């Protein structure tokens, strides 16, 4: 006979309220690539004209961002020659910035800190550091910056 199971009551524990940076990670040796799309009415086929050849070449992309007129992403700088070759062969107009880094700040409950990304931007822009892109999640904020 199965034992009756009691419902578990959720409760807050101390670490859920604690804040503070757990780690700061710098991933250097990256390149930021921005590929042009014909415009807001281009549709999925134009985006796939950029993404499909890269996928077929098994090139790993980070920070993929899709906008009506462009796709941008980050690749390892060592993969940039192959990315250039693939996009040139596909007839895609693009720009690439070498010497980038992805900086990630990891902290619990980061999403509940109002204005955090704005403060990070102020610090980076205040030091004349070029910022290509910023992204956040529940427990981290990452930015792609010019490192050199």
Which residue ranges define each predicted feature?
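A conserved regulatory-domain signal marking ACT and ACT-like small-molecule sensing domains
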Residues: 1-148
């Amino acid at each position: 006979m199965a034992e009756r199971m009691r419902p578990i009551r959720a409760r807050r524990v101390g670490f859920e309220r604690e804040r503070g940076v757990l780690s700061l990670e710098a991933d250097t040796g990256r390149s930021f690539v921005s590929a042009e799309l014909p415009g807001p009415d281009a549709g999925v086929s134009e985006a796939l004209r950029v993404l499909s050849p890269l996928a077929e070449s098994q090139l790993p992309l980070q920070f993929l961002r899709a906008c009506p007129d462009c796709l941008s992403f980050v690749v390892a700088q060592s993969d940039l020659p192959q990315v250039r070759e693939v996009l040139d062969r596909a007839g895609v107009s693009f720009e690439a910035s070498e010497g980038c880094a992805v900086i990630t700040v990891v902290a619990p409950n980061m999403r509940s800190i109002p204005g955090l990304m704005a403060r990070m931007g102020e610090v980076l822009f205040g030091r004349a550091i070029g910022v290509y892109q910023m992204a956040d999640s529940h427990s981290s904020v990452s930015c792609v910056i010019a490192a050199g």
